[in-house]
Amino acid sequence: MRRLSIVLSCLMALWVTVAHADDKLTGTEISDNNSVWIGLDLGSPHVITKVGWAPSVESQVLSRVVLGVFEGANRPDFMDALPLYMIEEKAMNNKMTYADVNCSRGFRYVRFVKPAGAYQNLAGLEFYGHRGEGNDSHFYQITNLPTVSIHTLNDEIPYDKVHEIVSQLTIISENGTKLLSEPGSIRERGNYSRNFDKKPYRIKFDEKQHVLDAPAKAKKWTLINNYGDKTLMRNLLAFELSRRLGMPYTPYGTAVDVLLNGEYKGCYQLCDQIQVHKNRVNITEMTIHDNEGSALTGGYFIEIDAYADQEKSWFKSVKGNPVTIKSPDEDSITTNQRNYIRSHFNKMEDDPHQYIDKNTFLRHFLVGELSGNTDTYWSVYMYKQRDDDTMFTGPVWDFDLAFDNDNRTYPVCNKKDFIYRSGGSCTGNLKKIVDEFVIRSDESQSLMLDIWDKARHADLTEESLVAYIDQMEAELDHSQQLNFLRWPILNKKVHQNPQALGSFQAEVENVRRFMKERLKWMDKRLGYTFVPTGITEVSAESSESSIDLTQPYDVYSVSGQPSGHSLEGLRPSIYILRQGHATRKMIIR
């Protein structure tokens, strides 16, 4: 084994050692012009089995190497790089620290990428391994979560929502045994969330890909930054509520660790891009030729969006609602198509009961209220099928401020009315539409209670939701530790945080508490009594006038909605029986 002495531009001595089981090789020093990384060209591929590092004595701060990343590549520009190891603990003073590498592929080029905000301050850097191409049997995965590693051409950093930067997009999963690595691009995404130091991204593969266990094979995917959500799970929990409340389509989402050009960015949520797709928003995708007759009627995908005026393809409705046209695409939509959907939206505003699908609107409403989401009507997706005048609502989206995470509405459960009626929680004229469609409609009230009742007797229970939160807390534990090393905000209020609880565990417990309280609050606000299933006895409470159950009678829910003329087939709940002037309360268990 021979030791290389490498002199950096900053005149700091760096020793780089490459050990080989048979041949003892030396490499050529390589580095970038900005001192972001240093490494070696080994001349030929080598399987790296161990790395070692030591901070310089001058650095004084041994934690400056924490979150530094080792990478291997077979292109000198590192576009095809894969992670070898990430440092998670402080180094020892004046001593080398070593770590085994669990990656079976051989690499010609190896490097160490300094953590964000630190100087390149290593006194010693060592690589161990053996010559060979290796194989693709296993790769390094940062935590139990999938690792998303993105490398851009010339290390360019995404800087806006318009310019797509050429990239290699890599996802390592299933404990390092599965690799997806394909060319694509990256740009920023989002609206207000782009203001945070931890940026949100949209990634796009050149060809459609099956990503992890997502239903859709697609090019476009999102990386949600969850910066103001210190549980890192609010969006995922809301998606779970969407599934349990029966929304036709709930976006796919899963937690991942993200690297960009070798720099650790934190824990993100990899999610569907909300778009027209057979496994996403499943409507007819229009072409520029769909300009008349049946073809002109759809499909359309729109977003009632407070930020619509920042988009290229948008309009303001007669009643003042800002609407972004998501599909047809802004670059291909025709004048006829734009005029048609604008006219149809205005008709919907004038007569929501004729045009809005109650089933999806009410389920969407319940998800927003159960989660206590201030932003529910700040951004609402809707879609229209071809040859159908109905406007459907969904999918749900954007829950960073939900579950008691907004100082403007905290504590949500202390409010007597629904969260959407809080000041500033609706864009445009949406509050009036929701009032008319939900609150003032007996038909909507009855259907909403039926939806709620079915969900409460399925898996929308306190026990199952708490179990889901517990599961997510365990799955996120390793990743959250690294995330809050990168972004030390647990003791700070960021965005609209009403409080800073100091730890991930305390933040999760706050969501767990809220979920329990909110279920009870919703039951009460909806006039609903949850009666567990599994008990067959019937108890009764009568008025002074008795009811003869052998004679005709009417059945009502406790909120006064008609429920038929027989107790047979009714779900467990409390009902009011009326026969002439006589009434009787029945509890079906």
Where are these regions (language model features)?
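Bacterial N-terminal signal peptides
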Residues: 8-15
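Aromatic, loop-rich ligand-recognition surfaces of beta-strand-rich domains
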Residues: 22-82, 95-136
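N-terminal module-boundary/linker segments of secreted carbohydrate-active enzymes
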Residues: 133-177
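Middle-to-C-terminal accessory/interaction subdomains
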Residues: 158, 182-184, 192, 196-197, ...
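Conserved oxyanion/phosphate-binding beta-strand-loop segments in alpha/beta enzyme cores
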Residues: 170-225
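Internal "kinase-insert"/substrate-recognition segments embedded within catalytic cores
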Residues: 209-210, 225-226, 246-251, 263-366, ...
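C-terminal outer-membrane/trafficking sorting elements
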Residues: 534-589
